Design a protein with these regions (language model features):
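Sparse, context-dependent recognition of short Cys/His-centered cofactor- or disulfide-binding micro-motifs
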Residues: 14, 23-24, 50, 131, ...
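A structured beta-alpha segment of the ubiquitous adenosine-cofactor-binding alpha/beta core
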Residues: 12-35
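Single conserved hydrophobic/aromatic residue that forms the stacking wall/gate
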Residues: 1-7, 11
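Internal helix-turn-beta structural module
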Residues: 91-97, 112-177
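Glycine-rich phosphate/nucleotide-binding loop
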Residues: 29-128, 135-136
């Protein structure tokens, strides 16, 4: 019944719609060059988005936005917590945890708050913080997960704290402009 209703809504809105099983969807996504909207139920979307982000880079680079039917938003890092890094941290061991998805979840929420409140300054801050993350990585400063897959020559692998400090330094430079 729900699938039939979704199909009817897509036809009404002139969106191409077809239903497929999860194994077929995974195969299609892995071969695809993109260019489509992929609507999934919560669990399927969670599993499949984790698979795609891991296959094409790092799960720690993906955020998630949940939108309720009545227009409420929740921004989160798609990967949840990084439990094994947390346990290493508790033992006093150094970690190289990529915090980009967590930062982007925060900036998404800040940007939305700025939009709702009409605070362009807050929206601009969120934009600059995201740009600072990207620039820091493009400048070759990154966590271990990114260093393993980058094409940037001689990346500097930073631990969690130093990576955040590097982003902060980049952001501070951008805020002065």
């Amino acid at each position: 019944k729900a699938i039939r209703r979704q199909r009817q809504m897509c036809i009404r809105d002139r969106i191409t719609y077809f239903y497929t099983l999860i194994d077929d969807a995974v195969a299609r996504v892995m071969k695809s060059e993109g260019g489509y909207i992929w609507a999934c139920k919560n669990y399927d979307g969670d599993v499949m988005s984790d698979m795609v982000s891991s296959a094409f880079g790092s799960l720690a680079m993906m955020t998630s936005v949940l939108v309720t039917p009545d227009g409420k938003y929740e921004y989160e890092a798609a990967h949840g917590t990084v439990q094994r890094h947390y346990y290493k941290h508790l033992k006093g061991e150094e970690t190289s945890t990529n915090s980009v998805a967590t930062i982007f979840a925060w900036t998404g929420a800040l940007r939305k708050r700025g939009e709702l409140d009409g605070s362009h300054e807050l929206e601009e801050f969120a934009d600059k913080l995201e740009k600072a993350c990207v620039k820091t990585i493009e400048d070759g400063k990154m966590t271990k997960d990114l260093a393993l897959i980058t094409t940037i020559p001689n990346p500097v692998v930073l631990n969690s704290e130093d990576f955040i400090k590097a982003i902060r330094s980049t952001l501070e430079g951008m805020l002065l402009l």
